[in-house]
Amino acid sequence: MSEYQNILTGVQVRTAPHSAPIAKGIFPRLGKPGFSYWLGKIGDAQIGPIYLGTTGVLSLVFGFFAIEIIGFNLLASVNWSPMEFGRQFFWLGLEPPAAEYGLGFAPLAEGGWWQIAGFFLTTSILLWWVRMYRRARALKMGTHTAWAFASAIFLFLSLGFIRPLLMGNFSESVPFGIFPHLEWTNSFSLNYGNFFYNPFHMLSIAFLYGSALLSAMHGATILAVSRLGGDREVEQITDRGTAAERAALFWRWTMGFNATMESIHRWAWWFAVLCTFTGAIGILLTGTVVDNWFEWGVKHGLAPAP
């Protein structure tokens, strides 16, 4: 007889492949459903079938072109050498146009490729959001996931499009590349007087750490009471059993307060959404409303006077 271990488990549920019915469309489900032993170790073992739909296919097409444009530009920057491309990959970048071009179209070699890649990437992401929203509606689900993703997209657009638009030139945007992106982040903070004194950045970090803490607390709690039926959270929301009661009692003993089986998910959702949303607000205020966050902090008693 298999023994259930709720950290590492050897028990995997295998049934006939299942999926919810969907209305007939242009694109049918793709692939024959199967099972993966290793995926079953961390999640549902079933793989497929996959439904992309019109927006899903278009999103992948636009995303492919964006990656190709970025990739070929990075390769061209090392004289088309695969060896150098692999060696310097983390340092390579595709830079936005210089400030002299403003919001206009720049020559390809001077930021034009960045603009084209940004258009394709943004279109791909927005189409994927539409796909998520429409799939949720088709399955008669709530659209919570789509709106959480929209918050992340808002931060993405604030960095690459909305703030540069407010500043009057695309040179304020973020380059494509790993270390170039990190260098931009560092320079951005230095140019505007230490971004750490931006209160919306503080809120964003608080929600980021809070999201990690809430996820750890919730995950640990459910695993701790799963042997008592705590994994059936939906049932425990409307008809609390011993698992929900014990979990609630544990947290009241620990910190004097407990969430419910329903409210913990709402807390986690809001913390995750507000992490990127407040981050985007902080980005949009930088350079447009506040030129130096350290001086702003000194003026409002947030930073020590020099």
Curated annotation (Swiss-Prot):
TM stretches of this protein: 53-79, 111-140, 143-168, 198-226, 260-286
Pfam assignment, any one: Photo_RC
GO molecular function terms listed in the Swiss-Prot or TrEMBL record: bacteriochlorophyll binding; electron transporter, transferring electrons within the cyclic electron transport pathway of photosynthesis activity; metal ion binding
GO biological process, one term: photosynthetic electron transport in photosystem II
Membrane topology: Multi-pass membrane protein
Ligand binding (a ubiquinone): W251
Keyword Cell division among record annotations: no
Keywords: Bacteriochlorophyll, Chlorophyll, Chromophore, Electron transport, Iron, Magnesium, Membrane, Metal-binding, Photosynthesis, Reaction center, Transmembrane, Transmembrane helix, Transport
Main subcellular location of this protein, as a coarse class: membrane
Keyword Hydrolase in annotation: no
Binding site for (7R,8Z)-bacteriochlorophyll b: H181, H201
Family assignment from sequence similarity: Belongs to the reaction center PufL/M/PsbA/D family.
NCBIfam families xref list: pufM (TIGR01115)
Protein task: The reaction center is a membrane-bound complex that mediates the initial photochemical event in the electron transfer process of photosynthesis.
Oligomeric form and interacting partners: Reaction center is composed of four bacteriochlorophylls, two bacteriopheophytins, two ubiquinones, one iron, and three highly hydrophobic polypeptide chains (designated L, M, and H).
Name used for this protein in its record: Reaction center protein M chain
Species this protein is from: Rhodospirillum rubrum
